[in-house]
Amino acid sequence: MRPASTTAGGVEIETLRVHSDERGSLFEPVDEPALAAQRNVHVVLTWPNAVRGNHYHREAWEVTTVFGPCLVRWRDADGLHDVDVPAGEAWRFRIPPGVAHAYRNTGTTAMVLVSFGSRPHDPSGGDTVSAAIL
């Protein structure tokens, strides 16, 4: 497991404690202080080698937790940043507005991604801007 938390390119990265036994694995995708600020949540299953994201938000912060394996990429003023989340680990990413982000499932089974947004979901895509980076 990597350091418990760090920041890279404006994105806060935190490794989470995963509890596993013969039944499966459990982790908390968002911490209590951040939970109160969230206005929507979605759970995403991503198939092997598929990519999700490829966008940024004009105003919203996004808190995304992935259960690896997964390649997480984001682009900020300093360029592209890549993080490989190992299989069986849960990592949380706090992504500020204006930072493009994307996720690729690098495994052989469905990847779980849980994402929280600081703004309510807008089906018209008002706060979400397409940005192909992966």
Indicate where each model-derived feature is located.
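Glycine-centered loop/turn positions within well-structured domains
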Residues: 101
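Non-catalytic, conserved peripheral segments adjacent to functional cores
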Residues: 1-92, 104-134
